[in-house]
Amino acid sequence: MRKNTAILFDLDGTLLPMDQDEFVKYYFGYLARTMEPYGYEKDNLIAAIWTGTGAMTGNDGTCTNEERFWKTFEKITGRRREGEEERFYQFYQTGFQKAKAVCGYNPLAADTVRKLKEKGYQVVLATNPLFPSVATESRIRWA
């Protein structure tokens, strides 16, 4: 008989309780307010992000999701990745952290993961690969 060596958890909504609609509303609202001083118009910015996200979900594997997102974002906004990527990275390191306020907390999550690791299991977290890694790492810490 084969022994299980890995345990798979869903991050969003399981280890990190959240109402997806509330989270997206808060996140996009804060992102739009943060980017407004740099000349971004809220509706255009949000449309560019949704369209870029859609492009990632349709990715055929010929490029990374990140490359696919930025190519789409550049077409819609007329802005170059090289000039904007650092600005967005800074947002995810600072402003995005405020989105933790609309996430819940499951006190059993961290304890369960810790106990499984102590027993020698590999713990794998599943999430849609649609956020930049800095945002995914933040959501893991929040859980």
Q: Where do the PLM segments sit?
A:
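Active-site neighborhood of HAD-like aspartate-dependent phosphohydrolases
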Residues: 1-50
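Alpha-helical elements of Rossmann-like donor-binding domains used by nucleotide-donor carbohydrate transfer enzymes
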Residues: 26, 30, 71-72, 111
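Residues within well-ordered alpha helices
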Residues: 34, 72-73, 115, 139, ...
